[in-house]
């Protein structure tokens, strides 16, 4: 399975957010360890016109990575407990990123169980803080490139547009009208139920 090319991340942020669904995130933190998960849920964030974005006001030391080249890894620590994984998507100097909200475990599941301290596979990666814990993703990856590290993306399965739901983002209090959350219909690993009725509800059909 080939890696996702650099130009993929230069597409508009909302396009990347949807196109990431079905892609395989791979992390090889050290020899003999390999984690893989299929992305099933994302959220887009933009510095311009999006008050829920960390960079909506100005660049700060914390959010400066969001202004780097597309394909840069942006990891931030939140709620005093969780590392959240984002991928930078806008041209250098313009803030924008896609949050990886949930994934379906593919490889390294037994190791993920140990990292998450649970035997329930359904709970391994069904949330942005859970998936980073499961895959040993931390602030050490912040600012790295998906093309030059042990954390990278592989081409996975193309998800038909009719099988993708679009809703408001979860857990925010600003810019709640923006329908910038994308997830695969009926996938059990999605982080939580939609905050509003989904735009469409159809049986999943995967395109090869």
UniProtKB/Swiss-Prot annotation:
GO MF annotation terms: alkylbase DNA N-glycosylase activity; DNA binding
EC numbers on record: 3.2.2.-
Keywords: DNA damage, DNA repair, Hydrolase
Superkingdom of origin: Bacteria
Entries under Pfam families matching the protein: Pur_DNA_glyco
Protein name: Putative 3-methyladenine DNA glycosylase
The keyword Membrane is assigned to this record: no
Family from the record: Belongs to the DNA glycosylase MPG family.
InterPro entries: Formyl_transferase-like_C_sf, MPG, MPG_sf
Top EC class, one word: hydrolase
One GO process term, biological-process aspect: base-excision repair
Matches recorded under HAMAP family: 3MGH
């Amino acid at each position: 399975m080939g890696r996702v090319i650099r130009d993929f991340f230069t597409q508009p942020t909302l396009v990347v957010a949807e196109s990431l669904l079905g892609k395989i995130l791979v992390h090889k933190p050290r020899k003999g360890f390999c984690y893989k998960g299929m992305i099933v849920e994302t959220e887009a964030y933009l510095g311009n016109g999006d008050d829920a974005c960390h960079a909506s006001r100005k660049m700060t030391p914390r959010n400066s990575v969001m202004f780097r080249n597309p394909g840069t890894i942006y990891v931030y620590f939140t709620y005093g407990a969780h590392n959240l994984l984002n991928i930078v998507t806008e041209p250098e100097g313009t803030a924008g990123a896609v949050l990886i909200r949930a994934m379906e475990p593919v490889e390294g599941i037994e190791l993920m169980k140990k990292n998450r301290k649970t035997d329930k596979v359904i709970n391994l990666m069904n949330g942005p803080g859970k998936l980073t814990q499961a895959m040993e993703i931390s602030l050490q990856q912040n600012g790295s490139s998906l093309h030059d590290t042990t954390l990278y993306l592989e081409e996975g399965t193309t998800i038909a547009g009719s099988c993708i739901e679009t809703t408001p983002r979860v857990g925010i209090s600003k810019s709640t009208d923006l329908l910038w959350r994308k997830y695969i219909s009926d996938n059990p690993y999605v982080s939580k139920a939609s905050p509003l009725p989904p735009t469409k509800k159809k049986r999943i059909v995967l395109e090869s």
